[in-house]
C-alpha cells in the first residue's frame, strides 16, 4: 500500500472535525463543497505540481505525471483475475487488459472500457482499480484498450480503435466467453467521448445493416465537446486540479493542431441533434470539473 493510501486510510478513520481542520477553509464552487479528504489530497498534489506547467513539460512527462493516480487508487478487487494481451485489431495490434470475475462463465456480459487523458496522455492501466470494480460489481468481463494517442496518431484514431475492438469482440465472443448481446461501452473523460461516439456510430450503421448494439453506455465525466470558451463550469472550475482549462487547451492543441478538425462531428457528440434510439446511459459528473456542464 502506498504512503498516499495509508494517509487516506487514516483520514477516513479520523474525526471529521480534525479532517476539516487539516483541509483548511472549504473549497466551494457553484454550490458544491469539496469533500475534506479529497481537498487534502488535491492540495498536496497541486503543491507538488506547482513548479511545473503543461507549457514547460513534454507529453511524455505529462503522461508520467498521470501515473500518480495509481498512488491514491485502492488495491485491485480480489475477486477479479487479469490477463494482459495484445489484440490484432483491424486498425493496429494494441495492448489490452482483460478483467474476469473469478467465477466467470462462458456467456458473461462484456464491458469495453476506454481510459481518460484527453486522447493525448495516460494508458489502459490508468483506471486499473475502477476497471476491476466494474468487472466485479457487474460480474462482467471487461476489456480496457491501449488505444492510439494524439498527436502521434491523428484524430480520430482512438475512435477507430474503439470500433475495431467492438468488431473484434463480436467476432471472437465465444473464445472470450462473452455474450455478444450484452456488451456495454464505458469510459471516463476522453474515454467517455469514445464510448459516446461509438454508440452514435453503431446506431447509424444499424440503419444500413443489422448489427448488434451496445447494451448500455457508462459515461464518466465525459468530454463530449471541443468548445472550451468561458462560461459555466469551464469558467468557475478553470483553475481546478488536476484538470484545468489550461489542460483542456493543451489537449485541444495536440488533438487538433492549428484547429484542424476541431469541429469534427466525432469530437462533438454533445451537439448531435439525433439522440434517439441510443443505448440506456448512465452519466456521472464531477462537481469540480471544467467539463462538468458537458455531462
What name fits each language-model region?
Residues 1-98:
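A glycine/proline-hinged amphipathic helix-loop "lid/cap" segment
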Amino acid at each position: 500500500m502506498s504512503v498516499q493510501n495509508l494517509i487516506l486510510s487514516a483520514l477516513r478513520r479520523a474525526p471529521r472535525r480534525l479532517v476539516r481542520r487539516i483541509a483548511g477553509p472549504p473549497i466551494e464552487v457553484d454550490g458544491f463543497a469539496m469533500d475534506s479528504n479529497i481537498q487534502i489530497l488535491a492540495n498536496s498534489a497541486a503543491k507538488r505540481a506547482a513548479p511545473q506547467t503543461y507549457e514547460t513539460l513534454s507529453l511524455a512527462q505529462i503522461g508520467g505525471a498521470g501515473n500518480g493516480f495509481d498512488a491514491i487508487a485502492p488495491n485491485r478487487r480480489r475477486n477479479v483475475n487479469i490477463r494482459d494481451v495484445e489484440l490484432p485489431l483491424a486498425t493496429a495490434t494494441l495492448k489490452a487488459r482483460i478483467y474476469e470475475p473469478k467465477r466467470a462463465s462462458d456467456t458473461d456480459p462484456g464491458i469495453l472500457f476506454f481510459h481518460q487523458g484527453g486522447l493525448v496522455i495516460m494508458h489502459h492501466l490508468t483506471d486499473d482499480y475502477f476497471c476491476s470494480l466494474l468487472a466485479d460489481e457487474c460480474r462482467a468481463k471487461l476489456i480496457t484498450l491501449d488505444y492510439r494517442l494524439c498527436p502521434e496518431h491523428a484524430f480520430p484514431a482512438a475512435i477507430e480503435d474503439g470500433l475495431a475492438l467492438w468488431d473484434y469482440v463480436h467476432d471472437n465472443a465465444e473464445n472470450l466467453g462473452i455474450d455478444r448481446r450484452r456488451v456495454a461501452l464505458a469510459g471516463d473523460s476522453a474515454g467517455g467521448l469514445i464510448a459516446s461516439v461509438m454508440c452514435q456510430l453503431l446506431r447509424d450503421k444499424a440503419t444500413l445493416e443489422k448489427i448488434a448494439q451496445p447494451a448500455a453506455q457508462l459515461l464518466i465525466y465525459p468530454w463530449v465537446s471541443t468548445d472550451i470558451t468561458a462560461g459555466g463550469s469551464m469558467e468557475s472550475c478553470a483553475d481546478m486540479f488536476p484538470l484545468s482549462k489550461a489542460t483542456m487547451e493543451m489537449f485541444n492543441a495536440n488533438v487538433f493542431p492549428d484547429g484542424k478538425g476541431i469541429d469534427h462531428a466525432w469530437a462533438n457528440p454533445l451537439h448531435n441533434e439525433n439522440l434517439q434510439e441510443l443505448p440506456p446511459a448512465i452519466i456521472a459528473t464531477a462537481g469540480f470539473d471544467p467539463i462538468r456542464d458537458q455531462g
